[in-house]
């Protein structure tokens, strides 16, 4: 049989084409089976869907897939390869969004909801105030963000905290001096501090911001107002949270910062980070040293941090974090009261660590299981007494030099103050605050307009205090747990609401319930042009705070318990309570370029803790304590009430893409309503505490009198920031100011004759101040930059409480080097 050659080759070509098409189809089918699917939706800050948004999926520097959103904002794109990806999203009229990097493996379906900010405004999201990532435009809470760029030339966070509304920062001394935060007139231990979801404050709320380094701080979020619903006790005035950065670059990147300045100041910092397939990593180490301006007041702080993440798949991630700080400083005391420096030292060690399992199920059910722990140790030593020793009936008393103490209110006192007492030296003391706990939290998105959040948290808190000189060896342990649930949603993308509540079971004070309700609405939605965007806000909430260890261990109940006594009606020290409501308006004056915010708040602090003398406990509370209680001079009780109300204003101006300015002003009206301190009861009895040089003026020697302002809460505070940013050059001027505030010298019966001539009237005793800082950064190359940070340009000496001189003008100059990272 003979075959035509043309037919043979034609048949071969047909079979080849058939096989090729089949093979290509098989490849496509196999690729689709192995593809990473990324889906979600694109919305504006008010939750409205954005159609025709362009979405690009980047792997490294390459665009591996792209697509556009549908009219309802939904999108879905696929990539044939696995690895780490970034979503880049843009749409006409909106700012470009660069999402957080994520891992996607074969067959993974990754859900990523995207929010595009209005043009020229970087989208800001709060998590602290709501528990869920929420655009600031949808939140009714009063929240401010401090970005990592704001901290780029700072060695700490203290001066940036001054640049926030409603916040009063008080630092007793210079670098490393104890720094407290008073928010909206609240107490200094009423701020919950969170590091990667780990409670960082002491048992009972105390936290020293003066030893917190800016190293490994990926910006701070400050929620003003109580949030006991989400964070339990101690979040009675505010919540301050920050996270350790994540590694994001495909190649390892090493960042180094080195600088030096006056007062023998130097700082070195190194950061190593990156991400490879399922793993992301970040580590950091720094040390800061300064001699300060007083003798024997040298300060140093060393910080180390790590953040390691591992993605099991596109929806489940494991993460572990640790942050450790070790610091030491002098204890010079109130130099202006003695004219001589005390010979003391304080050392602090703080370690915060935690681990999480994070899972998203089918895109709308999010679950997190977290273990957290903290270890905080503080040691203080008074090496030897300073001053002149004078013998008396009760031993030696050491007096400082002759000084004139001048108050900001025009009063003054001249003399020698008692600054130390005889005994065995050195005199050490130490305390520890440890915490371990577990938390499970879950949130479910029913629709784009309604979400639910709930959590359960268990904490095991332990504390000890040892002071051999005072024969104190105390310890305490608390096991607490709480439940909370919260609904969050919107109506027609115009009215946004938050409704939640929590039940806490505290070892000391039993069960407490805390509600919360927030509402935000837009009579005029944001847009371009004049006065196009009006947001109204309202919040109501209650908060509770547990006592700190020192007040618990010195409470009447514990003192009786230690003596083996019980008295009817005397129970453990109770919860401190707060009820607050606030309302405000955010008004766009000209689009997103000029914004004005106004807020009014009213706080009622009840059942606050104060020390009450033994005779007053018997007279006013009807409690007679037998003589068998050792060293009983009084005890801590829930007997103090005070109020705080005020207004907060903020103004932001984005003149151009290079120039930005913002400012704010806060007025605070606070008032002590009820107190049983010894000074108050002495005044009630007709024998007020006075200074013989200022007769007729009642003085609160250790706490404020009824009708007066609480100590160290300035009635007027404010700030302004002017910043210029270009491709290679960045400069900023930042200023904070504060009016005079009430305080005490705490020098009752402490002059050379045992009198009160150095105890000055409380009203406006602390000085007001204006602090001006400036920084300049120049980018020489993409890998190398130089900078200068200048602080206290006006050389203000009275930015802290009376008696404690502030660090005068100081500066640091240094360089930043970046290696690797692609």
Question: Where are the language model's segments positioned?
Answer:
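Conserved C-terminal beta-signal and adjacent last beta-strands/turns
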Residues: 309-311, 346, 707-822
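Short acidic/polar hinge/loop motifs at secondary-structure boundaries
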Residues: 198-225, 306
């Amino acid at each position: 049989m003979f075959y035509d050659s043309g037919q043979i080759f034609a048949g071969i070509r047909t079979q080849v084409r058939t096989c090729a098409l089949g093979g290509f189809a098989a490849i496509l089918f196999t690729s689709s089976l192995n593809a990473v699917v990324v889906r979600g939706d694109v919305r504006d800050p008010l939750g409205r869907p954005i159609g025709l948004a362009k979405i690009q999926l980047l792997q490294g520097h390459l665009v591996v897939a792209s697509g556009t959103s549908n009219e309802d904002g939904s999108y879905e794109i696929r990539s044939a390869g696995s690895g780490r990806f970034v979503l880049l999203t843009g749409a006409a009229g909106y700012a470009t969004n660069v999402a957080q990097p994520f891992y996607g493996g074969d067959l993974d379906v990754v859900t990523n909801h995207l929010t595009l900010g209005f043009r020229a405004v970087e989208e800001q999201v709060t998590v602290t105030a709501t528990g869920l990532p929420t655009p600031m435009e949808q939140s009714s809470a009063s929240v401010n963000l401090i970005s990592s760029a704001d901290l780029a030339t700072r060695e700490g966070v203290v001066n940036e905290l001054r640049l926030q509304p409603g916040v009063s920062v008080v630092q007793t001394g210079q670098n490393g001096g104890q720094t407290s935060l008073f928010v909206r007139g609240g107490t200094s231990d009423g701020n919950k501090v969170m590091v990667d979801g780990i409670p960082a404050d002491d048992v009972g709320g105390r936290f020293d911001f003066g030893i917190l380094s800016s190293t490994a701080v990926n910006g701070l979020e400050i929620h003003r107002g109580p949030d006991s619903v989400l964070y339990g006790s101690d979040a009675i005035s505010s919540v301050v949270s920050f996270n350790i950065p994540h590694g994001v670059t495909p190649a390892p990147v090493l960042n180094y910062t080195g600088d030096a300045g006056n007062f023998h100041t130097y700082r070195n910092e190194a950061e190593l980070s990156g991400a490879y397939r399922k793993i992301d990593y970040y580590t950091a180490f720094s040390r800061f040293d300064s001699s300060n301006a007083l003798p024997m007041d040298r300060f140093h702080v060393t910080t180390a941090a790590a953040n390691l993440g591992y993605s099991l798949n596109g929806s489940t991630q494991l993460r572990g974090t640790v942050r450790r700080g070790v610091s030491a400083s002098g204890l010079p005391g109130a130099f202006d009261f003695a004219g001589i420096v005390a010979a003391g030292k304080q050392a602090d060690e703080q370690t915060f660590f935690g681990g999480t399992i994070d899972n998203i199920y089918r895109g709308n059910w999010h679950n997190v299981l977290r273990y957290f722990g903290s270890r905080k140790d503080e040691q203080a030593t008074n090496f030897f007494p300073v001053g002149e020793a004078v013998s008396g009936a009760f031993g030696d008393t050491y007096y400082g030099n002759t000084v004139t103490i001048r108050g900001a209110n025009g009063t003054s006192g001249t003399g020698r103050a008692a600054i130390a007492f005889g005994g065995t030296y050195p005199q050490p003391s130490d305390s520890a605050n440890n915490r371990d706990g577990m938390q499970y939290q879950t949130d479910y998105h029913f629709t784009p307009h309604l979400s639910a959040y709930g959590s359960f948290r268990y904490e095991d808190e332990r504390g000890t205090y040892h002071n051999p000189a005072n024969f104190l060896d105390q310890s305490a342990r608390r096991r607490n747990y709480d439940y909370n649930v919260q609904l969050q949603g919107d109506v027609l993308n115009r009215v946004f609401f938050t409704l939640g509540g929590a039940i806490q079971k505290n070892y000391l004070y039993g069960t407490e319930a805390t509600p919360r309700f927030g509402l935000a609405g837009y009579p005029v939605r944001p847009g371009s042009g004049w006065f196009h965007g009006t947001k109204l806000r309202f919040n109501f909430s209650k908060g509770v705070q547990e006592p700190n260890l020192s007040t618990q261990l010195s409470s009447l109940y514990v003192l009786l318990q230690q003596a083996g006594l019980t008295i009817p009606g005397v129970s453990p020290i109770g919860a401190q309570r707060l009820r607050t409501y606030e309302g405000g308006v955010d008004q766009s004056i000209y689009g997103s370029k000029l914004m004005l915010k106004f807020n009014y708040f009213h706080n009622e602090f009840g059942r606050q803790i104060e020390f009450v003398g033994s005779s007053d406990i018997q007279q006013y509370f009807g409690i007679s304590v037998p003589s068998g209680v050792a060293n009983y001079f009084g005890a801590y009780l829930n007997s103090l009430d005070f109020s705080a109300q005020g207004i907060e204003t903020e103004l932001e101006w984005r003149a151009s893409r290079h120039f930005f300015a913002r400012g704010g002003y806060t007025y605070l009206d606070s008032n002590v309503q009820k107190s049983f301190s010894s000074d108050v009861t002495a005044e009630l009895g007709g024998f007020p505490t006075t200074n013989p040089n200022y007769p007729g003026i009642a003085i609160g020697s250790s706490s404020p009198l009824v009708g007066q302002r609480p100590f160290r809460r300035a009635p007027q505070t404010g700030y302004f920031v002017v910043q210029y940013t270009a491709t290679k050059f960045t400069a900023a001027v930042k200023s904070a100011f504060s009016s005079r505030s009430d305080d005490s010298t705490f020098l009752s019966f402490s002059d050379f004759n045992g009198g009160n001539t150095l105890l000055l009237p409380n009203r406006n005793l602390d000085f007001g101040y204006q602090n001006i800082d400036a920084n300049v950064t120049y980018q020489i190359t993409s890998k190398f930059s130089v900078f200068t940070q200048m602080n206290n340009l006006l050389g203000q000496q009275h930015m802290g409480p009376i008696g404690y001189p502030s660090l005068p003008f100081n500066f640091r100059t240094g360089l930043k080097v970046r290696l690797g990272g692609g």
